[in-house]
Amino acid sequence: MEHRAGYINIIGNPNVGKSTLMNAFVGERLSIITSKAQTTRHRILGIVNGEDFQVLFSDTPGIIKPAYELQSSMMDFVKSAFEDADVLIYMVEIGEKELKDEAFFNKIIHSKIPVLLLLNKIDKSNQEQLEEQMQLWKEKVPNAEIYPISALENFNVQAVFDRIIELLPTSPPFYPKDALTDKPERFFVNETIREKILLNYDKEIPYAVEIETEEFKEDDNIIRIRAIIMVERDTQKGIIIGHKGAALKKVGIQAREDLEKFFGKQIHLETYVKVNKDWRSSAYQLKRFGYNQK
């Protein structure tokens, strides 16, 4: 029996459901999900293994016009998704008319590899809207196979997965067959804490935050974690901590609960807040945090 393996890279505008889709494919919560734009900052790999296949799903940041160095690095992750894809998933949502970056859109419509256009959130539409959107995207991206789906409700996701398996090239596996992702444990600690900050703070605060896990010690029954929450300004530090530390405590409790579910162990989590001035515009800091791949 021939073995198939390949990279299935998911791209699209912010908040169209890319992370929800990858989590649905993988069956694990690898990508954090919030209603805020730019929740996904990195390119995250989720691996699905079968007896004769290995699918490497790649979740990418939503496509935006970069305003500072961090966002430019995020768009570099999207560019790399075009370079190594065996199948490209272009994800849109009901009511969406176009990708926000014309250069990326041109890459999609001139792609030499298979393109699956997934029209997401159809649970929020009626039949007439769905038919109009299907026709619109057939005209805009004639090289794509179009699937109406609801990633959140898991509608038609299996049909897309079955088609992906058919499109995979013949190849040995790229990773061990028990692998779930290419990211280390510390990455998921960082992302879990950052998700709670996105959910609990407004305006610019969540976007000025980066997390660094300083310590990750795993024993038989407990994992001890010490994490630093980086911000750019002293005023942001005060907001993160909150009155008598209440806001930071809330983030810590929520993150610990999710991490205990993820790792299946008791978690002892310590969080501290530190000012790292203008880190989003520093090439050195971005490289240190794993963004700048150049």
Features from the language model and the residues they span:
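Active-site glycine-centered loops adjacent to acidic/histidine catalytic or metal-binding residues
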Residues: 59, 120, 150
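Conserved C-terminal guanine-recognition region of P-loop GTPase G domains, centered on the G4
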Residues: 52, 76-144, 217-219
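Conserved glycine(s) of the Walker
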Residues: 17, 156, 247
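Conserved G1/Walker A P-loop phosphate-binding module
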Residues: 1-82
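P-loop NTP-binding site
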Residues: 185-294
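Catalytic P-loop NTPase motifs of RecA-like helicase/translocase cores
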Residues: 40, 63-65, 97-98, 125-126, ...
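Canonical P-loop GTPase G-domain recognition
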Residues: 114, 123-181
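Active-site phosphate-binding and catalytic loops of NTP-dependent enzymes
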Residues: 31-33, 100, 172-176, 199-211
